[in-house]
Amino acid sequence: MKKIFFILGFLVLSISSIACPICGCGGGNLYFGLLPNFSSQFLGIRYHYAEYHTQLANDPTQFSTNHYNSVEVWTGFNISRRLKVFGFVPYYANKQVDDDGTSFKNGLGDITAMAQYQLLHTTKRTNSNKVLDQQVWFGGGFKLPTGGFNVNLKDTNTTIADINAQLGTGSLDFLLNGLYTISVGNFGVNASATYKINTTNHDQYRYGNKFSSTCIGYYKIAVKQHTISPNIGIGYESVSSNVLNGAKVQYTGSHVTTALAGVEFGFNKIGMGMNVQLPMQQNFAEGQTQLRLKAMAHLTFAL
């Protein structure tokens, strides 16, 4: 597929001429979703999968299917009743299949640390004697450039596909996050939003800022001393264009809306769950790239 891409070696003089249809999904991701129902700290492992397919509109024989796999260690601690901190350490094992063959890229991704402060927590009884609980959290954090950004922008064979395949952004990036939860008895809704602010790396390349949000409804079913919580929801993600030397990179930036369904299990000090996201509406590389599937599974332990 590389043979049809415009080279990046001339970007400094003519960045507007880039024509690369590979999806703008590089730069890493952070997903909160439904947090474990533990009263204290937790430690767990999560698996994330995403699949994208690209096919050139003017030459269908040129294609690429990208499989993004990551295994992530995540943890959370209660510093106080109102303050929580989180850590995320991802390892990526990515695979790309295209008309030129198959390639792999594995390694440590960018490590993220965040803190959340509870702005509001109210609890009261409804007329039907059910407990109505509401919480509002707000926080922020940073992402360290621990993942590799090993691409030579002066190499005439380098493409945007190579940039999106990098394990990290090569930059110190920042995040803002808000979370609202409301539950009445066994039914609840969790809404979260995260804005990721990317900075320019040492190669003068900056991935686009990313806004992501989810709204998930769940119902908690008690089975003896355990719980099962099926959930459904909707997700939205919008990414602005990448920038090189102060100019926007063509065919980067995207937005996608997904439908989500999953289930969470609680066994005393053990939590596990999974979900699947399917696209309802999307726009990557002017329609030449399509998200096919996202999925997540986790196993988490209370400490």
What are the language-model segments listed below?
Residues 54, 204-303:
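Outer membrane beta-barrel transmembrane domains
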Residues 48-70:
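Surface-exposed strand-loop-strand hairpins of Gram-negative outer-membrane beta-barrel proteins
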Residues 41, 82-85, 122-125, 186-189, ...:
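Repeated loop/turn-to-beta-strand initiation elements of outer-membrane beta-barrel proteins
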Residues 43-51, 87-91, 138-144, 191-195, ...:
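Transmembrane beta-barrel strands of outer-membrane/channel proteins
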